[in-house]
Each structure stands twice: as C-alpha cells, then as structure tokens.
Amino acid sequence: MSKKVTIAYGGSNGNKFDDGVYEGTYDGVRKLIVGEDFHGIVYLKIQYVKNGDVVVKEHGRARGTHITETEFEVKCPDEYITSIWGTCRNDHHRYKSTGGRTFEQLTAADKYDINLAAKMGTPMYWNTVSELQFKTSHGRTSEQFRMPGTGGSNGVSWDDGAYDRLSKLCVGEDAHCVSSVEFHYVKGNDRITHCHGKDSKEHDKDGFISSLTFKTSMNRSSEKFGKPVGTKFQLEAKGFDKIVGFRGRSSVNRINALGANFAVVVVPPVKKLNAKGGVLGNEWDDGIHDDARMITFKLYFNKEYITSVEGHYGKRLAAPNASASAMSSFFTGYMTMLKFNTNRTTYQVLSHSPEYTYEGTSFKLEEKDHKIVGFYGKTEVSLNQIGVYVKPIANA
C-alpha cells in the first residue's frame, strides 16, 4: 500500500516526472546521486531496486566542472529513507546600494556607489567577480582614463567607450555572484544604455530546490546537498514509513520541484545467522517456523520466545591429578556449554563444571529486537554446530 504526498515543494516550471513506486519486500531506494552548483540542486539521479534489478532514473541534465556530484547510499532493504528536509527559493536579480537597501534599480540619489561582496565561484558562462564597485561624486570632473579589467578571463569582452557621465546603473546579483550590469550613460543630449551579462528576463522567476537532506530508518542523515537558502520544507507522510519513489519537476539545469511516494514498511524477511561451532558432522536444517517452542525444554507461556543462544565449543580438559576423559581425548571439539535465553528466563542445557578447565570459543547467537524461530547446524556423535533463524519481534 503506497501513498503520494500531495504537495511537491518548489516551482511549477520544468518537466513533470514520477518514478512510480518500489514497495516490494526487497525493493526500495538504493542510492541517491545529487548534482549541485552554487545555486542549489541541478540534477538528481536515483538508483532503485525492483525484484533484484537496479533501475536508474535521472532528472535534470546539467553537467560540467562547476557541478559537484555527491552520493548517498542506503543499505537496502534493511535501511530505507523516511523523510526529506530541504529548501526552495526563487531565482531573480537583486540590486543593492550602500546603506543596505535592496531594490530593482539605482538612481543618482544613491551616489552610484555599489559594493557587492560575493564569494568566489565559477558560474556556467564566466568567472564571477568577487567585488564590483562603482563610485562617483556629484559636481566633480576629471580626465578620462582606462583602468585594466579585474576578474576572470572567461566570457565575451565588452567596452562601452567614454561618455560625459553615468546617470544610472543597475547591478544584478544572482545567488553568490554578480550576474549582470546595466549602465545608463549621457553624452550631450543623448542617453545610451548598455547591458552586459545575464538579463533578469532570462532568469527563472519560478521556484527551484536549493538544498536537500535525507533521513533514513537507521536514524542516519545524509550531508546537506546544495545551499540552504529560501523556504524550508519537509517531505514526510504520517502513518507511512518508507519513501518508495520520487516525483516532481525538472528542467535542463535544475530540479524545480520535488515530491515523494510513501508506503507502509513490509515486515523484513527472516534472517539466517551464521552457525557457530565445529565443521565436522552432517548438516541439518529445521527450516523456518513461526516460533521455536521446544528443544530440550518447553516454553510454557504463550508470549515467551527465545531471544538468544549462548554456548561454548571446544574441549573439557582433565582435572588436576586425573586422567583425561574418553570424550576429551577422542573428540577434537564439541559443545561444552549451551543455554537458551528467552524474554522471561534462561534455560541451561549444559553447563561448565568448576572442577574442570575448558579451552575453545564462547559464542552468543542474538539479533537485537528479534526472536529465534528456527535452528540448523551440524551433528555427528554429538552436536558440533548450531545456528538459528531470527525474525523481528512485533512491537519491539
């Protein structure tokens, strides 16, 4: 039984995608590969497991040296993703003036003084300028001179030439870099405008996913992918435990929106633990049952079940001033101690005598929050090896 979370967070642009559901006992999300740049999440690659086969789905096609790719692997089927935290934001120009004001255009009242500090980065088309500054003073004239350009070497060169004065300028700030500059010049009675960089009209003013964090059933969280800027959101379905598929919208260079399909977790399959003891003897295997009720003792309570088996495999050495026992000299190894622990008590089948010393290996067969539902092992003249089947305890 699966359920779609009705809200997909982010914008409405991009191509719609829905990976469907992978909710079988052994199915689920195996690996997430997230591509990010200085804006946020640019693509999402998901590896699902369905009936033992790996199914790969990709959303967003942007690739390049400016993109960082990171993997988050889930230990499917024992581990699964339970929720997603993230942020979504709008991508548009912001114009700043001295004094901290932010608006679309600057006028002469702002003294043409712009100081946009941005971290060094590598946009898709050219190197970013770490600091762009324009300063003028009213009523001051000076000789014209040409200063060398500062910044990166990529991109298309431009030179507006010389004019009488600068009447207005606009600076576009996109995420952590200056993305465009627009100059309004005056020469005589003419007014000339030059714009360089990415025009604000080219920007996607719709929302997009800027960061993602995944949490699993083992209380493990992925690193934070992208830049946590914008409105926070969380994808989680009450009454449903496991994310079994993703859906949303994607464009060429970003994930615009993200939603998820959830399902109720199916009880994990029975797990076979490795047998402990010796290698001699004929193998036996009782198979799988709902519960183990009798070995050499009986579980008297309906709600009693075996939780672990403890034992010792090796030899009992002769007591001081005594001859070696026939069993000790004949066998290379055997079970010298065995006890069964239940949720109520402990049943000791074979114990160590304080009169003897023992050599060999002690062991304990146990899986947290599981009960023993079957046995297997090896026997010859004696019990040489014992192993168990376990399954999760209901309401553990």
Curated annotation (Swiss-Prot):
The entry's keywords: Lectin, Repeat
Keyword RNA-binding appears in the UniProt entry: no
Gene Ontology molecular function terms on file: carbohydrate binding
Domain Jacalin-type lectin residues, every copy: 3-138, 144-264, 270-392
Family to which the UniProt record says this protein belongs: Belongs to the jacalin lectin family.
PANTHER family hit by this protein: JACALIN-RELATED LECTIN 3, JACALIN-RELATED LECTIN 45
Protein name: Jacalin-related lectin 45
Organism: Arabidopsis thaliana
GN (gene name): JAL45
